[in-house]
Amino acid sequence: MKKAGVCGHFGIGRNLLNGQTVKTKTVTEELKNRLGETQVAVADSCGGFKAMPRMAVDVLRLFKGCKNVIMMPANRGLRFFAPLFLTYNKFYRRRIHYIVIGGWLDTFLESHKWLVRLLKKFDAIYVESETMKAALCERGFNNAVVMHNFKKLNSLSENELEYPDGEPYKLCTFSRVMKEKGIEDAIDAVKTVNSCLGRTVYTLDIFGQVDKDYEERFSELKKTFPDFIRCGGAIAADRSTETLKSYFALLFPTYYRGEGFAGTLIDAMSAGVPVIASDWKYNSEFVVPGKTGVIIENCNSEKLAKVLADIADNPEKWNSMRLSALREAEKYSPEKASRPLIDRINGRDCL
């Protein structure tokens, strides 16, 4: 019998770079590294409601053949997989785990209270931040565990850090390209600060896969881009730090309602790049002012432009955070961050 089975959005055969797919693959890869390639089975939840009969069979296979069964659904999938896991577990008595992707669970439970009773029966629920855990504890959960988001990246060494020292300073966004991630605020802010200062102080590169619901709008936006704004496309995970290391700052003015511990923050820290982020959801737990970047309260394009103008007056102070950002990334290595899950799979509970 295998040690672990993972049911998640692998998107097998498809080139998907969204947060759910990336985290599902990252966690599974680390399980294989720590437990052994042959000790981990997978079931792909990609396909939506039409694929549910197939998914039910695949999950049953995991319960039959694995000591620990893990689910990693998005919010719609949670309504299907939580009851399914508990139904199968009446017969197989496995250790069942739920790894939360993003920061939407507490809000979702407010309108789906029937799920609370079900999720309390899981052996552990792994959330991405202390704030998320506290919210679940307020609802009476005693099985919530913090497992920070993590990525397997080619982190820089300290002597590989780059310190941009002249205008124009390179800025970037590095997330799914959609309005709710603050893409338009970033564009407007860079336009504003360059216009107000009368020169090209900043350039902006927009990296990431364009959300399918935003493709038409973004296509129109690109037609209006000045020379100092360009679209860089999607970047492979193993190239993120190499791509980011020369950038002066990463902009993350998100207001995406499902935001958790965003992987883009780990990408930035691993490249030694400080972040300018909105005070949204859980960003303030991970973007530490004076250490890894700056947080903007009630962020909008005007406030972002003001912060950028202030930073341009003292770029040396901004660059002084690059080393501390790189060191902070060590907390989110797969080896360290995955320990709560690995310990429980190996029977070392510490709730």
What feature does the model see in each segment?
Residues 245-259, 273:
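Acidic donor-binding loop of glycosyltransferase active sites
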Residues 310, 317-331:
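A short, well-ordered alpha-helix in the C-terminal region of glycosyltransferases
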Residues 5-7, 162-181, 186-192, 204-207:
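Conserved donor-binding/catalytic core segment of Leloir-type glycosyltransferases
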Residues 289-290, 294-301, 310-316:
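Conserved acidic donor-binding segment of nucleotide-sugar-dependent glycosyltransferases
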Residues 120-158:
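Donor nucleotide-sugar binding/catalytic pocket of nucleotide-sugar-dependent glycosyltransferases
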Residues 44, 203-216:
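Glycosyltransferase donor-sugar binding loop
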Residues 216-236:
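Nucleotide-activated donor-binding/catalytic signature segment of Leloir-type glycosyltransferases, i.e.
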Residues 251, 270, 274-277, 287:
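Short hydrophobic beta-strand element within catalytic cores of glycosyltransferases
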